[in-house]
Amino acid sequence: MILETITIIIYSIALVLIFMYALAQLNLLFNYLAAKKKEENGPKFNFNNSEEIPFVTIQLPVFNELYVMDRLLDNIALMDYPKDKLEIQVLDDSTDETVATTKAHVDQLKAKGLDITHITRTNRQGFKAGALKEGLEIAKGEYVAIFDADFLPEPNWLKKTIPFFKDPEIGVVQTRWGHINRDYSTLTKIQAFALDAHFTLEQVGRSSKGHFINFNGTAGVWRKDCILDAGNWEGDTLTEDLDLSYRAQ
């Protein structure tokens, strides 16, 4: 009898929690639909006025990414942004031949006039967060864009994201992820669907009402001062992106 009562209580609590979660998701859906109807009419940077264009640093934290580094670097080199207002940091913590091949590729891009630097460390203290933190110490940009090695941003990515920072209240802009291998298998289709729901409904729904959102670790751009004001990157957590996001808010 006691066991039966306990089971019913646990089951009832689970149902209540599921119902509350469903209501929260429904609220995000309504927020998303409302936000979708609004036109983006906020202030924009004038990219025809060089004095108004802000300096941007792109950080590429990598670790043993030998098979995607050439693709990544060639893609980033195509970024459509004034070259005198852009620097690229390759934060290479690799322990294999990635270091040598990446350095050679970086040297080639640098010879073509790209402001790109290959940065290595004698230790991996703080892992990804540690690499981002050390790169930030010498970053020249007022804004810092971050991409993992398997991301391929469109050439106009910076021109579509940086203008949001004309609003001084904006500290970070997170963009949605695309999927190169969406149709590879049933599993990748499910993963792509889940990520699309997160970015489309959850992130937009939260942001539209001023609720907490989180930086997803890549494909986003930070105001440098926002990172510093929040206490900078911390390497003592497995989710440095979520940790910084909540401290910043």
Predicted features, each with a name:
Residues 1-52, 203:
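N-terminal membrane-anchoring/stem segments of glycan-assembly enzymes
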Residues 28-85:
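N-terminal signal-anchor transmembrane helix
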Residues 60-62, 92, 147:
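Short beta-strand/turn micro-motifs composed of small residues
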Residues 66, 96-97, 126, 151-153, ...:
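A short, conserved beta-strand element in the Rossmann-like catalytic core
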Residues 74-120, 124:
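Acidic donor-binding segment of Leloir-type glycosyltransferases
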Residues 94, 148-152, 236:
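The conserved acidic donor/metal-binding loop of glycosyltransferases
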Residues 106-143, 155-238, 249:
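Long helical/loop segments within the catalytic core of UDP-sugar-dependent glycosyltransferases
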Residues 238-244:
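Acidic donor-binding loop at a coil-to-helix junction in glycosyltransferase catalytic cores
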